[in-house]
């Protein structure tokens, strides 16, 4: 081996060791646990190898509810947050003098502690013995009855959850899209204006294709992030998400390991592998679509 290649591998060695210990080994461990039936955590023994853990998880009503919640969050929050971020970024790009100021303001929710933001949302939406919450006060002004967004109907809790998720993830998307818009060559716009091209056509034919790599990057990472949702739900609804009916797949995995029904690493591993397959499948589909629609 040449000295240059050896030197390169030596530079990579710490990262390879780190990834091997904290990523590759846990993944292998999860795969092994998922197929060990009747695993006893205390004695580290199991009764056999098979598909029972997957069968149990896929028939567990708590897991099915978690899958439903996760998919609703993914389907709603990813396109809504990306679309709103694009609109705000276009607006920021058109007001040059105050662009940096507004960009900083919009980015604040992203750097704010998740639990702190969740507490604020609880104050806004939660009904208590002393107040119905700020949002319900606004609803009452319009003559409608108060809604218990935190402990009330499922649709109300899901609305708060999606609203919260969009609020938290949108600042990062605004920052990325604003940077992407700033990198578009102004010569394209000048040439289009000389030809008398309308603003709508400029957006469809120039702006959108030029920033399409960043849009698909945000969509793919948005899907992955939304499927891993858990801490946001805890911030608003507390740790017992099954009672609230707002658990997610990651929350189900955590409960199987450490919750009241915990101590079942085999079930947790099976659920984690199912989540991995779902995320991998959707990511591959997104990448295949991006090859046909992204302009590099």
Annotated model-derived regions:
Residues 2-296:
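A structural signal for multi-pass alpha-helical bundles of membrane permease subunits
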